[in-house]
Amino acid sequence: MNQYSEYALIPKKKPFLYRAALNYYSAYHAGLKSFAELYKDLEHYIDDPNRRWNYVLRVKRGITDTSIPGGLYKDQVYLEGAVKILKDRKSINFYALISGKISLEDLKRNFLMKILRLDNLMIPPFMRDMKKFMKGLDRIAKVNFID
């Protein structure tokens, strides 16, 4: 979300989650298609052959036989996480979320909130103005029809 939050505040720009969605699509279809088939399939969405190659390479990296279906699926988790954050943005304690390896589900555990240490927390630059950050998230959610 951090790469979108500043961009979301530029009035003429539209902070679409298309890259995350395209990565999700690529990851899903990597499990169904070979490298060549996925490359051809992505032609519908990505005109530039070099860019298309990079998308396929991203999900097929480390696979020894790219002629068979299979790939890395972590990009599916990224989009799902972004959507969850956008849907729950008004109830999330973002300071607690960035305080360590904490999931959105962990934030719902009362005992955790009691033991978290939020003093001396290193706040990332994009979150220093929480009002501005939330306004950016609101815009990202609106542009992507998430609410």
Task: Identify the residue ranges that each predicted region occupies.
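Conserved alpha-helical "signature site"
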Residues: 16-147
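An active-site-proximal "capping" alpha-helix that borders the catalytic cofactor pocket
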Residues: 1-10
